[in-house]
Structures are given as C-alpha cells and as structure tokens.
C-alpha cells in the first residue's frame, strides 16, 4: 500500500517519515505543509527550503534556481564545500546527475554513510512528491565540481 506509512529514514534529529514503499516521503506525517511564500510547491527549491527550516537550518527565501543555490549561499555567507554533512543542501549544477540543463537541482542530505554514499531527499523529480535517493561515493566523485554542499 503506497499510502501507508513506513519507518523513519535518515540520521537527522527530525528523520523523514517514509511511505511503505520506502521511496516516497510522507510530508503530511512530518507536519510539513504543501505551501511556501517564495518557492513553488513540490519544486526542488521548495523542499530544500522547508526541510532545512524543519531541521533548524533555514535558508534565504530568494536563493534562485537549484543550480544557483551554491553561489547565492556564498553571497549570503553560508559555508559551502565539496564535503557532505547530514543536513546540507546538495547543489547540482545544470545538467549534472540528470538535473535540468537550465536550472540545476537541489536536495537535502539526510545521511552520510560510512562508505561515503549519501541518502538525499528531494522534490521536483516526480509528480507532486518528495522522494529519496542514495548516491554512491563513486558517483559523487564522478560529479566532481558539478556539485557542492551548503552547510
């Protein structure tokens, strides 16, 4: 039953609440409203903004398109690096890892695993949903300068 609730996911203090398919995030069960003042609901930027606010690491309401977030973060004084930490926003430059070739993509790092892989949560990849993805350390390394992490 894809509408059932699965277990928690991630290592943040406020873990994701998963549907029974362990792919879709149950945002209503997490108390996250499907509204926002500045980002279009269910776009990647909306999810990164509301998830960061939920974990106590809010971002500015005007960071731009996903691929712009790392540059905006630097302008706003947020630390940006090439090393992931749980709670970071991962910023994909346009066209990297299947992101939109014009707009790029952002997601939230939920877990950094001992093997260097990361679990991310993201929106803007499907119809009106938030989903998870594990990216291997090898894939992250292959993306090189096409990704960055906003702490």
Region locations from a protein language model:
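Secreted/periplasmic proteins that engage bacterial cell-wall peptidoglycan
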Residues: 3-114, 119-123
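Aromatic- and glycine-rich peptidoglycan recognition patches
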Residues: 110-151
């Amino acid at each position: 039953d894809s509408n059932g609730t699965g277990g928690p996911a991630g290592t943040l203090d406020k873990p994701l609440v998963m549907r029974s398919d362990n792919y879709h995030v149950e945002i209503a069960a997490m108390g996250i409203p499907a509204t926002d003042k500045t980002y279009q609901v269910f776009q990647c930027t909306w999810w990164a903004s509301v998830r960061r606010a939920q974990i106590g690491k809010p971002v500015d309401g005007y960071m731009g398109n996903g691929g712009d977030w790392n540059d905006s973060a630097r302008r706003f004084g947020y630390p940006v690096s090439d090393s992931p930490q749980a709670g970071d926003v991962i910023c994909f430059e346009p066209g990297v890892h299947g992101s939109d070739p014009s707009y790029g993509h952002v997601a939230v790092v939920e877990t950094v695993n001992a093997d260097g892989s990361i679990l991310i949560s993201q929106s803007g990849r499907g119809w009106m949903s938030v989903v998870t993805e594990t990216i291997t350390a090898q894939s992250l390394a292959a993306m090189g300068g096409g990704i960055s992490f906003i702490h």
